[in-house]
A protein has these predicted regions:
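Phosphate-binding site recognition
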Residues: 1-295
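Positively charged, low-complexity/disordered segments
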Residues: 291-308
């Protein structure tokens, strides 16, 4: 009798791609979508319902694309993470993009609060935490004194949270400046990833402070203008297309990819559930025989049927 492979652990509550691979959690391989997402357009907005894998896909993109800033050209971390996954079969794409890009990746989920003051504060905290990932740029010989001074402002939590005109100016310019700093240091235009871009606006609309919030968010998103010389690609995810009051004023010719568009990128598909989960998952997670496979397959289909 052939010995059965040990069951993989099913993990919920984490959206970090690297943890799935590092700790051996069960992972449905969707890395074949990295190239369609990356090649779609210089400015791409992906719209999907909640729990559709958007955040995990953005995490996967970051781990695939982001270069080793200490050792540019070293892709050993990516080689280990993506070994045996579908994207590794696309050698041309991997050689051109795996570990080759500076990346700025941020989620605006925490900025969805019930009052303007709390939303703005959480947005400021999000920017502060993001900026701390790039504190090492203070030692870059390629940045001028003005750029380093602005970076110090981004690292000043009290300044960001203060809420006056100076504070708003730093907050609104934060993404543009982080991209500029990385561009000047690395000599490569970074990829900008914004997850849950619409979350603070949804809460603002529901709680009647949309006009206040849009005055902060609109300048923040000016980084996405195609005239911006400091980013190569901008990829956003969310549930809704926020068009009220011109949030994307000046941003022309960007691509929207939703479940209604003909060129949609299927982050979840019926055949993924049918074959990827109901077949592969049962064998790897611990199913035994066709009866168990049918039972788990039926449960998977029932859970995902609203999205087929």
């Amino acid at each position: 009798m052939t010995a059965e492979k040990p069951a993989l652990r099913v993990k919920s509550g984490t959206e970090d791609f690297a943890k799935y691979i590092k700790y051996g959690y069960y992972y449905v391989d969707k890395t074949q979508y990295l190239r369609p997402i990356f090649d779609a357009d210089d400015r791409l907005l992906i719209l999907r319902p909640r729990r559709f894998g958007k955040t995990l896909m953005m995490s996967t993109l970051r781990h695939f694309l982001e270069m080793d800033y200490d050792n540019p050209g070293d892709t050993s971390k990516q080689q280990e993470l993506f070994k045996g996954l579908k994207v590794s079969e696309d050698q041309e794409f991997c050689e051109a993009n795996m570990g080759r890009h500076p990346v700025v990746s941020v989620s605006l989920k925490d900025a969805g609060q019930t009052t303007f003051q709390s939303s703005r504060r959480m947005l400021a905290m999000t920017v502060w935490k993001l900026s701390n990932q790039y504190e090492w740029l203070k030692n870059s010989p390629k940045l001028n004194d003005g750029e380093k001074e602005f970076l110090n402002d981004l690292l000043d939590r009290k300044l960001l949270c203060r809420g006056d005109g100076e504070s708003d100016g730093v907050l609104q310019s934060s993404l543009s400046m982080l991209c500029q700093l990385l561009h000047h240091h690395c000599g490569l235009k970074p990829v900008l990833l914004i997850d849950e871009y619409d979350f603070p606006l949804q809460y603002a609309a529901m709680n009647h402070f949309y006009d206040q919030m849009i005055e902060i968010i609109r300048p923040l998103f000016s980084v996405l203008l195609k005239t911006n010389p400091d980013i190569s690609k901008g990829i956003l995810t969310g549930c809704l297309r926020a068009t009220k009051e011109g949030i994307f004023t000046g941003l022309n010719n960007y691509t929207v990819n939703s479940v209604l568009t003909q060129n949609r990128i299927d982050l979840h598909r019926a055949d993924d559930v049918e074959h990827g989960v109901a077949g592969e998952a049962v064998a790897r997670v611990g199913g035994h025989g066709r009866t168990e496979e049918r039972r788990v397959g039926k449960e998977c289909r029932s859970r995902w049927s609203p999205y087929h």
